[in-house]
Amino acid sequence: MRLRSSTLCAAAAVLAAAAGSLPCSVLAATGSNLPNQIQRTLDDYLAQRRDIEGVSAIFLHVDLGDPGPIIEAYAGSDGLRDNAPVNGSTLFQIGSNTKHFEAAAVLQLEAEGKLDIDQTVGHWLPEYAAWSHVKIRQLLNMTSGIPNYSETVAIGRIMATDMHHQFANGELIDAAYPRADNVLPVPGGWFYSNTNNILAALIIEKASGSSLREVFKKLFSRAGLHDTFYADGVYPDAVLARVLVGLYKNPECLAYQPVPCEHSTLAPLLGKDMREQNLSWAGGAGAIISNPRDLARWVRALFGGRVVPRRQLQEMTTLVSQKTGEPVAHASEKEPAFGLDLVQAYRAELGGLFWYYQGETLGYRCIFAYWPQYNLVMTVATNSQPPAGTDKLGDFVLGKVLRILADASIIAPIPQTGPR
């Protein structure tokens, strides 16, 4: 779907009115071609990547803070019965972007004196004795050494045969827990594991005395989110009606399948629409439904200090190497870094240092990127999990839009050198 320049400017004006900025005057000063260039980038992504990545729609939000511009653009259709064009009310599964909401919930509890992130799993969840030494901080920065339940054959088989299965948190954790009949490789250094976030969810519920859903609802309200929802399982019809079709297209084997592996445990799901999949398999690790507009609001609120106090935000942005798990001051080109469920990266062609996260479920991808040096937040979402090695959403869309903004002097010229 094409979105004409005048329509894009009008949409930006509506968004800006709520944010207190005046995008159209800024856009006019840069020439009328900027909206068309951004729209063309989305159209090109769909045209070039539709068959490769299995996508049919994309939603982009660009927020340069006060005074703007705020730009929103969409392309493609939702794939539902009426095949309606994607618009500002369309919703996506945002996958592991759920994790930084969860980290914020933990840190808010710390600020309230209800827990300390240097307390251990053993302190809060003594039933998991094998991991009793692991600190909450290590759960959130992925240095716990705990295997990933979502890559196990046991969980994969259930997901492949019953998309509506209601997982309990204990069922997910048990798939990764060491036993004589369940020996998984014990990762060292930094290792990405969804099990960390299921454990953190249990700690949140125990420390707060509330369900994770209720804790998240308070966070959503504090950040001013209107289109963000969490259900540990089946979503209400009113929410699902706004979620577009999302396809599973990735034939790659699960990490813990026996080698050699010819067919993925999840192969029965290939080509299927994952829109109505029960998201209890993801829970606190990845079950939020939202859209790029609300995710940008969240990122602004989080980094603006409106979600957790400054001390806790400093803890959240304290980094370890994604290669070694050891503390680092900042990311470099060869060594991305991880905070408490946040990623910092350095790429010269993407403006130097920036914060980001890419969330992914079996049918959706959603990325946020935040450049403090430009006061720029970009969020984008699309509707597939593509074959391994084919995902070009971030580079194709965010990279091109960043260059468009720089060429239009909306942001400063992009540096070509920096910390490496």
Please identify what each model-predicted range represents:
Residues 1-11:
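Bacterial N-terminal signal peptides that target proteins for export
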Residues 26-29:
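Boundary at the C-terminal end of the N-terminal hydrophobic targeting segment
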Residues 52-56, 82-139, 182-195, 283, ...:
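Short active-site loop at a secondary-structure junction
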Residues 10-21:
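Bacterial N-terminal signal peptides
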Residues 133-354:
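Short, surface-exposed loop or secondary-structure junction motifs
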Residues 35-92, 114-116:
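Short, conserved catalytic-motif segment at the N-terminal edge
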Residues 357, 365-385:
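Short, well-ordered beta-strand elements
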Residues 324-326, 385-420:
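Short, gly/Ser/Thr-rich active-site loops of penicillin-recognizing serine hydrolases
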